[in-house]
Amino acid sequence: MSDTQAAEPLAEPAAEPTGLNRWALRIEYDGTGYLGWQKQNDGTSIQGLIEAAASKLVRNRPVPSITAGRTDAGVHAAGMVIHLDFPDDAPIDARQIRDGMGYHLKPHRVVVLETAKVGPEWNARFSATWRSYRYTILNRPARPGLMENRVWHIKRPLDVDLMQQAANHLLGPHDFTSFRAVACQARSPIRTLDVLNIHRDGELVMIDTKARSFLHHQVRNMAGTLMMIGSRQWPVEKIIEILEAKDRCAAGQTAPPEGLCLMDVGYPDDPFNRS
């Protein structure tokens, strides 16, 4: 799964075999300098760091992981949810997982926020019913200093009202072919956007979106298109033409990864008991 690609709504997988204890983890990370979530042979990935840290808690035995969303290189997460399968003979509890992994993850910018024991049928990917993302634009003449690698810097003034007018046309179910990466492997381009809100806080323009799942690069491609409309390079009505074109070349550029952050993942029965 990429920065915005989530699970296809497939049949529920069978429960894992016994001999393992499944734990849900909520984690945050700064994606700068990493190769994204998925393990790679030629660099450091978030998944590789997580599994290595977990393995050290059980005498270097393998601890496989599944994530709610595979973020791309440079993309951040404030509330990613994963699950880990620890050997059932390992004497380990929630605090030991959080604090022990926190110790072994240093000095990397990857943190375990919460842990919760779950049943073998619970799956971080397939049990999720929604994912939410935020794309952040720094809208000012001066380049970012403190927020470098966390925002997309746009000098031209952005009209958030125009951006919201365009965004409203993307709500609900649509064929998002124009907004998915050419290499997207999803079987269907149909997705349903539940939320797509744009607001300004001083020099920051935030694009917040929520859906059950997203296509590869969908959020970043929507951000690139909305930027063109907010900067008055395209009219609001252009968004309708782009949707109807079903052609990636019709939409705006793919916004850079550093502005994107996975904010949260939702489940019918939240393992972390959040209200």
Curated annotation (Swiss-Prot):
GO terms for biological process: tRNA pseudouridine synthesis. InterPro entries: PsdUridine_synth_cat_dom_sf, PsdUridine_synth_TruA, PsdUridine_synth_TruA_a/b_dom, PsdUridine_synth_TruA_C, TruA/RsuA/RluB/E/F_N. The active site is at residue 72. The keyword Repressor does not apply. It comes from the Bacteria. It catalyses: uridine(38/39/40) in tRNA = pseudouridine(38/39/40) in tRNA. CDD domains: PseudoU_synth_EcTruA. Keywords: Isomerase, tRNA processing. The keyword Lipoprotein does not apply. Substrate binds at residue 133. Its EC number is 5.4.99.12. It is an enzyme of class 5 (isomerase). GO terms for molecular function: RNA binding; tRNA pseudouridine(38-40) synthase activity. Formation of pseudouridine at positions 38, 39 and 40 in the anticodon stem and loop of transfer RNAs. Homodimer. NCBIfam families: hisT_truA (TIGR00071). Belongs to the tRNA pseudouridine synthase TruA family. This is tRNA pseudouridine synthase A. It comes from Gluconobacter oxydans (strain 621H) (Gluconobacter suboxydans). The gene is truA.
